[in-house]
Amino acid sequence: RVKNKNIRKINNIELINYTFNLAKKIKLIDKIFVSTDSKKIIDLAKKKKINYILRPKKLSTSSSSEILSWKHSIKFLEKKGEKFDYFLSLPSTSPLRNQVDIMKLIKNFSTFKSDLAITVTKTNRIPYFNMVKINKDGFVKIAEKKKNYSKKNLFDITTVGYISTPEYILKSKNIFKGKVRSILVPRERALDIDDEYDLKLAKLLLKK
């Protein structure tokens, strides 16, 4: 994990500013909010004239549920009298996404009237294939027997973007149990920054 990764600079731009800059370019987005408990991120948001939602500490840990933070944001905004048809989440850890990806996501959601639309990329391996589990005694066992999977219909979920409605998010215990659609994004634009290696890779890809 990377400490304070959202404000780490990649090619002299804070990671979260890549998302701020993109969101401001998309005309279909009426209002932009950032949910955070960080004063530094709030200051960056203010410089971009972006609204902020103060996220509770209990929803700001590395193990916190993203969905719970969505619910908190929606409830907060509704109490403030905000009304909106769609809820679009653009996690700051995907700086390589572009306008085309997000416009496709919005169009897919509005066209097919699903409960949720997500972004995916083609998987590069079959789950559990060549994966092992290390037992307490230090010995290795195959994680699970190979199942009848095919790469053709298997995809990895990305953090490029998610879109739903406030109503669906608030009522759902598991958002994937509804009608879920997806759009395919290229793997090079689906990088999710989680560690130092990801930061180095993003730096190289963003220079292209």
Predicted features and spans:
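N-terminal glycine-rich phosphate-binding loop and ensuing alpha1 helix
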Residues: R1-T36
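Short, high-confidence coil segments that cap the C-terminus of an alpha-helix
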Residues: I29, E82-F84, K113-D115
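Short phosphate-binding loop-to-helix
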Residues: F33, K39-L88, L96-K104
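Histidine-centered beta-alpha loop that forms part of the nucleotide-sugar donor binding/catalytic region
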Residues: K57, P91, T121-K122
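Conserved core of the sugar-phosphate nucleotidyltransferase
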Residues: L68, P95-V185
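Hydrophobic helical membrane-anchoring modules
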Residues: S182-L184, E188-K208
